[in-house]
């Protein structure tokens, strides 16, 4: 079941838990996976889920439509993506973990899905804030292993140089050449 936004949804920063929450109803809250160190605002606030938030929510849902997620997984990724767009402070690219594929012509589009390749694995990300040189992304794979000790799990937010983004349709062909 896909959750539909309504006028009662509210973003809340809980200072006690140091967590951003989406209050969906009196008895249901969604805890955003963005770590406090990546949030632009870390003091108590409450803000309604806006029309822009709803628009992003439905756009991201549509962009993930072809992927084999359960409805709860899809909603979780999308809510984390909307929260990241709205509340994440500017991040520094950590592109050194990723292989340079340089297969992108032009700027990526909002909601477009790409594959990324590291020394250890590959995974998929969705663009949540495109840029001309680097873009803010959310991990949609279960995890992406960056090095022997560090990995990004699903719904983690990262900034990547666009030269590291492998168009999703070309990923199979590219990855088969690597094997």
UniProtKB/Swiss-Prot annotation:
GO terms for biological process: division septum assembly; FtsZ-dependent cytokinesis. GO terms for cellular component: cytoplasm. Keywords: Cell cycle, Cell division, Cytoplasm, Septation. The keyword Cell division applies. Its main location: cytoplasm. It is found in: Cytoplasm. The gene is zapC. Contributes to the efficiency of the cell division process by stabilizing the polymeric form of the cell division protein FtsZ. Acts by promoting interactions between FtsZ protofilaments and suppressing the GTPase activity of FtsZ. The lineage of its organism: Bacteria, Pseudomonadati, Pseudomonadota, Gammaproteobacteria, Aeromonadales. It comes from the Bacteria. This is Cell division protein ZapC. It comes from Tolumonas auensis (strain DSM 9187 / NBRC 110442 / TA 4).
